[in-house]
């Protein structure tokens, strides 16, 4: 048989893992992202009206029936998450505000799924590390200024915040719209991405390569470590991560990416 025939046969036999990615706003509003949310615009997800809505969202996503749930929590925190989830199953832990627990724990309980931590920090080049090391230098301060007063400010795409007016479910549907995800990636290609310490250098591009692109590649690598026995994987991360993670899943021969809005928009 030809190499092409063997390759085709192997592809037919290989069963890709199904993946559902859910991009979220952070339910506990830590305000660590570029877009800050003022206290008056925040919601308390522990209030009865939002708890009822979160239960509905969890039940919709549980229809995917994941074997594994991947969450935005440091890889080194796996033992702590396992302990909290075990306590939750035993009725000895009250869920915190975070989407990790409000959605991740609920769905894992409903589907008897295993939870996996997958967050990581990106690595920077030695030159960028040196730049970030001392915030008293003019070079550092000029770089910081590129965040605050960027000539590209008018080009940034801001998330439309509708959770307070319309609810959590409409917000999640909006955040996971492919058009919105594509716009979001554009934010990482302007502003400080174009910053140059010296004319013609790549300070901004190198910084963003480590902070965002390398970080998400590492997250993807952590997800690849999920056991192959998991036929269906639900990934719950901040919505911005989907601008790279979804693309990686779409390109990978190991996974079949499904549309999360097909689940969120169902009436069940």
What are these regions (language model features)?
Residues 1-10, 14:
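Single conserved hydrophobic/aromatic residue that forms the stacking wall/gate
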Residues 71-76, 120-121, 237-240:
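Short, well-ordered beta-to-alpha junction loops that form the rim of enzyme active sites
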């Amino acid at each position: 048989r030809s190499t092409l025939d063997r390759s085709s046969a192997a592809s037919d036999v290989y069963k890709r893992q199904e993946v559902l990615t859910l991009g979220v706003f952070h339910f506990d509003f830590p305000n660590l992202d570029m877009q800050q949310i003022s206290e008056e615009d925040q919601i308390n997800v522990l209030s009865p009206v939002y708890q009822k809505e979160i239960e509905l969202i969890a039940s919709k996503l549980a229809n995917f029936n994941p074997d594994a749930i991947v969450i935005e929590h440091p890889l080194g925190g796996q033992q702590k998450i396992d302990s909290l989830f075990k306590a939750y199953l035993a009725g000895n832990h009250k869920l915190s505000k975070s989407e990790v627990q409000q959605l991740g724990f609920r769905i894992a309980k409903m589907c008897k799924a295993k939870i996996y931590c997958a967050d990581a920090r990106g690595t920077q080049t030695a030159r960028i590390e040196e730049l970030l090391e001392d915030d008293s230098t003019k070079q550092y301060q000029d770089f910081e200024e590129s965040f605050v007063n960027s000539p590209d400010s008018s080009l940034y795409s801001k998330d439309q915040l509708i959770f307070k007016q319309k609810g959590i479910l409409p917000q999640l549907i909006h955040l996971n719209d492919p058009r919105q995800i594509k716009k979001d990636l554009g934010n990482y290609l302007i502003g400080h991405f174009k910053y140059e310490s010296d004319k013609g250098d790549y300070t901004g591009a190198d910084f963003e390569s480590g902070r965002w692109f390398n970080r998400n590649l590492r997250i993807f690598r952590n997800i690849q470590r999920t056991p192959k026995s998991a036929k269906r994987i639900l990934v719950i991360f901040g919505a911005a991560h989907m601008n790279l993670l979804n693309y990686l899943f779409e390109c990978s021969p190991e996974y079949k990416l499904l549309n999360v809005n097909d689940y969120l928009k169902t009436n069940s």
